């Protein structure tokens, strides 16, 4: 489940969504330009762990609020009967900010990498902005203040998320991208669980924002340290660096060169993240109004933990298996179909046990998908020198669902059809996502 990214890759995402999302390919799967990291020296377990911790930090900062902190805070600042619309407005505006910020951060990181051989200044700047947003949310006592704080959180943390996704394209050999991409997905899952646990542990109150404001920078330090030795011009063996072209290169349309398969991979990521956004947006209220949970925050935590533990286990196994088999599409297909079945079951659920069964299916589906998502999306990149920009655009597929989901969900949940219609629509979207794999020819 996700972000959200973002969050970014995916994402993830997703995630990666994900931020975003946040990949491996055989020689037959990639163009020569996309395959340039193939000769990079292998990354170690420590580097992959540091990358994963960075993703955990970003997604905890996104999904602790999305799962519990924002809905609970909206209850305190909104008039009776307006909480659904107020939450949709806050989340939607934040997602719109993310939508714009994600590709811009990616483009900026590309230009910084060309000049300095590292993307880390984007991590520093984005983290600082995101922490300011968390402090604003801690003090917020009105809807506008919450919008401002959440917008800063989305704006800021999309910076490090964009860098984390791009580092896979920069540093990881193609033979390791399945496992690296799956750990990117696992980081999203652990971040969602961690953020939710933190939010529940502090009693669903605004103190959770301060805890995240301290924890997020601490976890992001790991990738800054781990990547320091590699942060030299083309130390990954990707060939000679193209010279910087100044402002003209930044705005040139020629710098953006998506392939047809990139477009299908983008749509696949978008649709899967949309199903996830539909699930998460009103989960708190669904468990309250339809299921009648006595401890709503605790029930959200229970559903989240069940879903995401299964996702994490499945994603890790899927990434390793896809590297060995050099097959990605079959895992993504199984993930989309499992998600569809889980959402259909959720549409019929009125008891906690049935919700838990649906959560297990959704966890399985999300794990299968994010285990190969990053591998699929990076195998379609057309140009190594614009990987940050292209992955930034790919991370829009993590954040755009956060804009679309409120617009789609709010009218459904207040209609006579209610939550069954919402989750039924989500199941249909998952089936359409599965169909996107048919024209995705360059990925096996």
Language model regions located:
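Juxtamembrane intracellular "pre-TM" segments in multi-pass secondary transporters
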Residues: 3, 23, 30-45, 230-268
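Intracellular juxtamembrane helix-capping segments at the cytosolic ends
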Residues: 70, 159-172, 369-382
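Helix-to-loop junctions at the C-terminal end of transmembrane segments
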Residues: 101-116, 314-327
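A late C-terminal transmembrane helix in Major Facilitator Superfamily
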Residues: 385-415
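Loop-to-transmembrane helix entry/capping segments in MFS-fold secondary transporters
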Residues: 81-85, 174-183, 297, 384-394
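Helix-loop boundary and gating motifs at the non-cytosolic
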Residues: 37-95, 261-293, 297
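Structural signature of the two symmetry-related core transmembrane helices
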Residues: 119-135, 330-345
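A membrane-interface helix-boundary motif in multi-pass transporters
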Residues: 120, 201-216, 411-430
